[in-house]
Amino acid sequence: MATCIWLRSCGARRLGSTFPGCRLRPRAGGLVPASGPAPGPAQLRCYAGGLAGLSAALLRTDSFVGGRWLPAAATFPVQDPASGAALGMVADCGVREARAAVRAAYEAFCRWREVSAKERSSLLRKWYNLMIQNKDDLARIITAESGKPLKEAHGEILYSAFFLEWFSEEARRVYGDIIYTPAKDRRALVLKQPIGVAAVITPWNFPSAMITRKVGAALAAGCTVVVKPAEDTPFSALALAELASQAGIPSGVYNVIPCSRKNAKEVGEAICTDPLVSKISFTGSTTTGKILLHHAANSVKRVSMELGGLAPFIVFDSANVDQAVAGAMASKFRNTGQTCVCSNQFLVQRGIHDAFVKAFAEAMKKNLRVGNGFEEGTTQGPLINEKAVEKVEKQVNDAVSKGATVVTGGKRHQLGKNFFEPTLLCNVTQDMLCTHEETFGPLAPVIKFDTEEEAIAIANAADVGLAGYFYSQDPAQIWRVAEQLEVGMVGVNEGLISSVECPFGGVKQSGLGREGSKYGIDEYLELKYVCYGGL
């Protein structure tokens, strides 16, 4: 049986033994063989080789501040959402550690801003290369801590690395302007300068990509960062810190302060209100985003917010049913429905409704397989925790009580408390929770509509507007709907729209600013106007 050689050699005594493939458990004074099988359903107890052989250097449990690995006064557990088993104990940073990280980032900023764009570009490229070299290990870390199917985790690592590659190139494309003024003896210059220390707060659903999308832009611009990763998935952020160090990113430029859910509020407030922080970048819920905006307002900090969504997926009568179903599958069930751009409500025109629902249900039954993310063939892993399952369950029960029909799924999965069956509902009406509350799970509610105007009205009724999708073969309709949807991103006959080259962000209460693309670096730059006279 495979054993955890990486755990035996890494010296990280706080690591738990229940990573898939692991047969050792830590105790005071050393590591001893496991006394028995890990708890949970038999199918989830152990996946030999899941993390066995993982690079020891990548599995870190301390905070990373000023180029050093530092413990905290306390630790908190990180669990495998598939089995509920403890993966390890991680440094539980508090306000003191947060302030120390900000100070380290500020001191580093005074030096990093003077590094040439070419050198910053080179270092980011080295970081990218190391991610590619370690992509298999990084993917396994994601699957272990988030439950995401391994195939999707590999996809995230590539997506994550590509942000470093992209911004390594954008670092050398930060241009200013020369403006000719009415006065003959003057010239006006516009300089773009790094804004300063950025506080970066990231979610659990994309624990690697949401970091590099922000940090790549910040470092390319000449800023330094303090990253507070989600408490459910800190290992990915810490692995990135190790690779950043190996790439030669200077001490203090990239700092990571993991913390428990108990400390998250005060740590978030500490880094967002610190006078040495000039920029806040957050991906998460709209509710938390509003709290951070309040913190930022007191000192008028620059903010980027990528918040909640309620993405509509509209299928018009002219749509190709097979294409629409393929798009619906991709949009809804990636990461088990736990993405901010997942379709949240399906609006299907009356003439195509029955054919779409039938084909959608058949595709779900044929192509979706619930299981542990390390198991080959799994397409739907666990939800991140039982609270997430309870939310999906509540929405399903609410809809059914108000007249919705369960086409397929509809209940918890037998694999364990964090699993829920991929669910399709029809006869859904707008008074149901699932139509105005972001689900973040494998639930697809279908609303029947009659006219284009009706569909647009339903889609735009939300107070958020991140992404929207629609399928149509009518060119005139395509232009009308694309322009009328009140969202930041539109997929036309396409269910997957994210790309490093394209601007990511929303309107209304879905956020502020854009990430990725040529516009992403601007979020970390200040414009300075210089008037040069006496010429």
From Swiss-Prot:
The modification N6-succinyllysine is found at residues 126, 135, 184, 265, 402. GO terms for molecular function: identical protein binding; succinate-semialdehyde dehydrogenase (NAD+) activity. NAD(+) binds at residues 213, 228-231, 284-289. Redox-regulated. Inhibited under oxydizing conditions. The active site is at residues 306, 340. The modification Phosphoserine is found at residue 499. Keywords: Acetylation, Disulfide bond, Mitochondrion, NAD, Oxidoreductase, Phosphoprotein, Transit peptide. Residues 1-47 form a transit peptide. It catalyses: succinate semialdehyde + NAD(+) + H2O = succinate + NADH + 2 H(+). SUPFAM superfamilies: ALDH-like (SSF53720). Disulfide bonds join 340-342. It holds the Pfam family Aldedh. It is found in: Mitochondrion. One of its GO terms (cellular component) is mitochondrion. It comes from the Eukaryota. Its EC number is 1.2.1.24. Coiled coil: none annotated. Catalyzes one step in the degradation of the inhibitory neurotransmitter gamma-aminobutyric acid (GABA). Belongs to the aldehyde dehydrogenase family. This is Succinate-semialdehyde dehydrogenase, mitochondrial.
